[in-house]
């Protein structure tokens, strides 16, 4: 999730950074003139009090003027894609842009309605409770042929689940449960299981781990040293159920479609597969994520720029505490999906899925305005 997710994030986004260096000068003349511009161009969505008139529309009251100016400039230049706002920005002169930004910056900040705090980890814990009958407590399977999910990489988990849903992978017992899960639930379960400690396993009755280790040299290029993956989209093999791992490897001879894996597996005998499985089964694994503390880790990074008291006059950075949750969600998704041009925010939000974005948006919407 540090690469999936998971945390990230004005109208389609009040989040982002720009190098606009206009100082915050709140002159009375600009405030008065800006109110006239706001009455003409902005009040239908943002009100004259700076409060968004519907969910998904950001509050502008108390927002940094230099950020509002930078956002309007980006709409005017087409860097941000919102048809109505591009037209609004085009209707404003440079003076009017400064004036309306000054007007909204002069208003007392408005606290958006506080939503319920969403926790991807806690939601995943609830979803995972339906999986324990087969996959074991905390995702450590004790059923031969059923994979352990503890410590598994989250993007791989999401992708594998999608393959079951589309029929690319066959598993009749999984089907009814999976079809009750939405994308948010699947991502949440992925985070929860990725954060669990994998149990150690004893050697399986077949295969020789010592003979299998040399054959894993090529495998390690993708699956990591000793089968502990460092790539969120590539599965960890260490401490996996041996019967399941054997079946999964051999499936590349028949039903599974992956050119590289199919070619590599075609070169292996059954005994060599048993040896490889014996090696990976007995390796120690570890959690791929830090689910219970992940949100705190991400928000600590966000606050380096976005905390209200950390205003950098050289950057146009928005205040996000107390902002509308739906707007924050839209903004983060837009950065993640490449629909906004800010490279800094794009790089920050790229790894995060909907469950982490939902957690972040509800977290900041619940913070007091400053």
Name the predicted role of every residue range.
Residues 14-16:
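C-terminal motif of bacterial Sec signal peptides marking the signal peptidase cleavage site
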Residues 18-20:
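Bacterial signal peptide processing site
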Residues 27-48, 116-140, 152-153, 204-228, ...:
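Sequence/structural segment immediately N-terminal to covalent heme-attachment motifs in c-type
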Residues 35, 51-77, 86-88, 139-165, ...:
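Gly/Gly-Pro-rich "capping" loops immediately C-terminal to redox-active cysteine motifs
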Residues 66, 74-83, 88-95, 104-115, ...:
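Hydrophobic, ordered structural segments
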Residues 135, 153-154, 179, 184-188, ...:
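Extended non-catalytic domains of envelope/secretory-pathway proteins
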């Amino acid at each position: 999730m540090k690469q999936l997710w998971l945390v990230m994030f004005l109208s389609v986004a009040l989040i982002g950074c720009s190098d606009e260096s206009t100082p915050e000068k709140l002159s009375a003349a600009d405030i008065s003139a800006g109110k006239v511009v706001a009455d003409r161009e902005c009040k239908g969505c943002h009100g004259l009090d700076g409060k968004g008139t519907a969910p998904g529309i950001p509050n502008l009251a108390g927002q940094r003027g230099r950020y509002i100016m930078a956002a309007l400039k980006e709409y005017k230049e087409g860097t941000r894609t919102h048809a109505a706002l591009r037209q609004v920005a085009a209707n404003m002169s440079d003076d009017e842009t400064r004036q309306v930004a000054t007007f909204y910056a002069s208003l007392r900040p408005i606290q958006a309605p506080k939503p319920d705090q969403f926790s991807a980890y806690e939601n995943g814990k609830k979803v995972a409770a339906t999986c324990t009958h087969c996959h074991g407590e905390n995702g450590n399977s004790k059923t031969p042929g059923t994979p352990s999910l503890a410590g598994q990489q989250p993007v791989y988990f999401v992708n594998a689940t999608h393959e079951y849903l589309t029929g690319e992978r066959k598993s009749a017992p999984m089907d009814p449960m999976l079809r009750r899960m939405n994308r948010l639930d699947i991502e949440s379960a992925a985070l929860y299981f990725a954060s669990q400690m994998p149990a150690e396993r004893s050697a399986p009755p077949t295969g020789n781990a010592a003979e299998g280790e040399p054959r894993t040299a090529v495998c390690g290029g993708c699956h990591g040293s000793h089968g502990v993956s460092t790539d969120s989209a590539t599965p960890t093999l260490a401490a996996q159920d041996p019967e399941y791992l054997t079946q999964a490897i051999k499936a590349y001879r028949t039903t599974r479609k992956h050119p590289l894996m199919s070619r590599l597996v075609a070169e292996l005998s059954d005994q060599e597969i048993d040896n490889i499985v014996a090696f990976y089964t007995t390796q120690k694994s570890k959690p791929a994520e830090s689910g219970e503390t992940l949100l705190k880790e991400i928000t600590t990074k966000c606050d380096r720029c976005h905390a209200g008291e950390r205003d950098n006059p050289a950057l146009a950075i928005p205040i996000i505490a107390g902002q509308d949750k739906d707007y924050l969600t839209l903004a983060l998704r837009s950065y993640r999906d490449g629909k906004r041009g800010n490279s800094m925010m794009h790089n920050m939000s790229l790894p995060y899925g909907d469950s982490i974005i939902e957690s972040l948006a509800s977290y900041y919407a619940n913070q007091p305005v400053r």
